[in-house]
């Protein structure tokens, strides 16, 4: 019997050779890893907030607000990846608001924390220089308003683009391009501003003392600033890169999905297997890593341990209970920062550290007075000596 002739047309139904296949167990394992990482960060931040109450720090401070924002961010990411355990399809077909809340709003929260850090460190610089340049204090209100305005712009751009992607008939790539152009520019500018603030603080003598009293160092602050700016800059470059590649038609034949996955997964209506893997890696590198570093750096410390550890507090500086975001005993308002005191008034400002010096001086003077009194009462002994 003669074999039927080979017809290449019938091979069109075969799957493409270069299409990647992610085994189900790999996807399930990555989902478990992502969920565990975000859940652990959530538990760690929750413990930090509990320590704020435990050590009786201020309830409302830069530190507590920062931790609350990170806690909300970690909870949203944990909920997002928990959806992929049971229903992968449902996780890709959320309503517009749920899509924005789980995919886009965590990026907004991360930007809010970056803005908050800029606001605080800029205010620290103002207060450190306020004795010699009092006119700097008048810029505090414009600084607050500018930070609020930038945060609102970032929020509105993300919300509008997310709604248009899910409901409108607009070109998806155009919408994402607008979002990337505005939001990533703000990210990079805030990261650069943060690095400049940290650099200025590292050059200030009072700031160095303040960092040492917290148990950190200028090297740690510099490392955190450089890491943050590099991560956020590379994030913006990645988003621009995938936008450029997604417009090249002949690249689509490879169908690897990674060039279509932005940091908010808004370039694809359905996140495929490979796209899901890339999305998780993107969030790990540009969200989980910098947030974890900053949360750990600004964690709540035990004041009792700081008091018993002489290496944590320099002999020339701040009270050991001074922290980056709050002082649980002295600060009733931001105007009570110790840096508002001139250097010549350090003895009155940092009384806890200088009490020991005063006691040593008093004991020395007392001994000198005793010797002088003895020599006065017995002049013969003095002359014989």
From Swiss-Prot:
Compartment list: Lysosome membrane
Annotated TM spans: 33-53, 65-85, 97-117, 145-165, 174-194, 223-243, 278-298
GO CC annotations on file: lysosomal membrane
Induction per the UniProt record: Up-regulated during osteoclastogenesis (in vitro).
Residues in the Cytoplasmic compartment per record: 54-64, 118-144, 195-222, 299-385
Residues bearing attached sugar chains per UniProt: 11, 260
Known tissue expression: Widely expressed with high expression in bone marrow and kidney. Highly expressed in osteoclasts (at protein level).
Signal peptide: none
Source domain of life: Eukaryota
Keyword Protein biosynthesis: no
Disulfide-linked positions: none
Alphabetic keyword roster: Autophagy, Glycoprotein, Lysosome, Membrane, Transmembrane, Transmembrane helix
Lumenal side: 1-32, 86-96, 166-173, 244-277
GO biological process: autophagy; negative regulation of bone resorption; negative regulation of osteoclast differentiation; positive regulation of protein localization to lysosome; positive regulation of TORC1 signaling; regulation of macrophage activation
InterPro entries: GPR137 (IPR029723)
Topological category with respect to the lipid bilayer: Multi-pass membrane protein
Family: Belongs to the GPR137 family.
PANTHER family: INTEGRAL MEMBRANE PROTEIN GPR137 (PTHR15146), INTEGRAL MEMBRANE PROTEIN GPR137B (PTHR15146:SF0)
Subunit note: Interaction with RRAGA; increases RRAGA recruitment to lysosomes. Interacts with MTOR; this interaction is amino acid sensitive.
Role, per record: Lysosomal integral membrane protein that regulates the localization and activity of mTORC1, a signaling complex promoting cell growth in response to growth factors, energy levels, and amino acids. Interacts with Rag GTPases and increases the lysosomial localization and activity of Rag GTPases and thereby regulates mTORC1 translocation and activity in lysosome. Involved in the regulation of lysosomal morphology and autophagy. Also acts as a negative regulator of osteoclast activity. Involved in interleukin-4-induced M2 macrophage polarization.
Protein name as catalogued: Integral membrane protein GPR137B
Organism: Mus musculus
Taxonomic lineage from the root: Eukaryota, Metazoa, Chordata, Craniata, Vertebrata
Gene name of the encoded protein: Gpr137b
